[in-house]
Amino acid sequence: MPGSVTEVSARRCAVAVLAAALLVAALLTAAAHAQPAPLVAEGSLGAGWRVAGLPGQKAPLTRYGVAQVDGRPAVRLEAAASYGNLVFDLPGQPAPQRLRWSWRMERPNAAVDLARKEGDDAAAKVCLAFDLPLDRVPFFERQLLRFARSQSGENLPAATLCWVWGHAEAREALLPNPYSRRVRVIVLRNKEDAPGRWFDEERDVAADWRRSFGDESAQVPPLQAAIVAADADNTGVTSVAHVAGLRFGP
């Protein structure tokens, strides 16, 4: 009898350990595949997506609406001498292996010049904001970031990587933002890509991270947010684009 009790206890212990292991694996899998909510749901912006401007911003906010374009539910980005980001917060979530979306240009911004402050606008961009540890940020930029955080009262990301629809810039060009090196942009589309046509994108996030910020951290840090945006506050013109189907993948 004692042996039987011992066997039963051992089996129960094994089952409990297995159940705990399966639960942990399920939680880790769920975290690894955490997704931003769909950009569009039931004819409106998806739950959790919010429009955010700059502290003390004087320019109007970029307008984000919903449209059906060629049968696709899409977000309409209209920038008119405006600034504003469509943000989905993902604090502490692991970065995805792949980032996918579709976009099309309707009215390009021919005044864009991503290398200069006066041309630093985009008719469409998709970004990931990363929670890079401050000790990885170069000293001078770290001090500027700390000051900006204290002035704004917001936890501004230490690293943001954007994939941008530019103008005259070459495809795959990598550029630091002219206002802050805490933002790097990779140009995917430009004036040679025809308006009124959908383009499907798929990016290797780790490869693009290493290319952009690899000198600061070879390891991809956790996310802070996913961002879809358009702005025209520097160029003062109007642009229109659509973005659809933003999703993470292996």
Predicted regions and their residues:
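Secreted extracellular polysaccharide-interacting domains
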Residues: 76-96, 107-114, 180-189
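Extracellular beta-strand ligand-recognition surfaces/modules
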Residues: 124-126, 181-191, 195-236, 240
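Extracellular beta-strand elements of beta-rich domains used
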Residues: 226, 244-248
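Bacterial N-terminal signal peptides
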Residues: 15-30
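Extracellular/lumenal carbohydrate-interaction signature centered on repeated Trp-anchored short motifs
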Residues: 89-99, 192-195, 219-220
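Extracellular carbohydrate-recognition regions
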Residues: 34-57, 139-147
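Short carbohydrate-recognition loop motifs
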Residues: 62-84
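Extracellular/luminal beta-rich ligand-recognition
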Residues: 121, 125-179
